[in-house]
Regions:
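Short, exposed coil/turn segments at beta-strand boundaries within extracellular/luminal domains
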Residues: 1, 25, 70-74, 80-82
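Extracellular beta-sheet/turn segments enriched in Thr/Pro/Gly and aliphatic residues
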Residues: 1-10, 80-98
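Short strand-edge motifs at loop-to-beta-strand transitions and within beta-strands
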Residues: 2, 42, 50-52, 85-87, ...
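A short, amphipathic beta-strand motif
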Residues: 4, 13-21, 50, 89, ...
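Structural motif
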Residues: 17-29, 102-104
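Short, acidic Ser/Thr/Gly-rich low-complexity loop/linker segments typical of extracellular
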Residues: 27-29, 34-56, 78
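A short, solvent-exposed beta-strand micro-motif common in secreted/extracellular proteins
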Residues: 58-70
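Extracellular glycan-recognition surfaces and repeat-rich motifs
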Residues: 98-164
Length: 167
């Protein structure tokens, strides 16, 4: 038996920030804030005062997305996040959902191939694209709501045995 001690190779930091409404500066409670990079994803929720904090965060370059139902999604690519970073996010009022974040949609219906948020996987039929393998380039992030996102032929991962409903 060999005793082994694991050391943290990467340093971690604590970051904090706020989510407020444009024009009023009012805090936005329960806003989702996502820090994403090729190596890490961290999802946070703002508190009743629109504030968030995370300890044990790996510093680096992240895409930052934030949103809340009733506000337009915030997107910032290539943001350097380091120790002591205070990330202040301002959301414009409005109804908008590009599915980069999950705002609580409900999936129902008898089908086994249900809606899910994911990076779209292309399907083809006779060499032609039947379903695209990418999200819309003009919105935040790279995710979309798709049904059974498995790729292959258009009949491999489609909706069978009834409907699947997204509300």
């Amino acid at each position: 038996i060999l005793d082994v001690e694991l050391n943290t190779i990467l340093p971690t930091v604590t970051i904090s920030g706020s989510v407020v409404e444009a024009g009023t500066g009012n805090p936005i409670p329960n806003a989702t804030v996502l820090f994403t990079s090729p190596q890490f994803d961290n999802t946070l929720t703002s508190d009743a005062n629109g504030l968030f904090t995370i300890a044990g965060f790996f510093p680096g370059t992240y895409d930052v997305l934030a949103g809340n139902w009733g506000h337009r999604t915030y997107c910032s690519s290539g943001q350097n996040v380091s120790g002591g970073s205070n990330i202040n996010i301002v959301l414009d009022k409005g109804y908008y959902d590009d599915f980069a974040l999950d705002f609580g949609w409900t999936v129902s219906g008898p089908s086994g191939n249900e809606w899910e948020i994911g990076v779209p996987v292309s399907t083809t039929n006779n060499g032609q694209t039947a379903n695209p393998g990418a999200d819309v380039a003009t919105d935040c992030g790279d995710k979309a709501f798709v049904t059974d996102n498995g790729g292959g032929g258009p009949w491999d991962n489609d909706v069978d045995q009834g409907n699947t409903i997204l509300t």
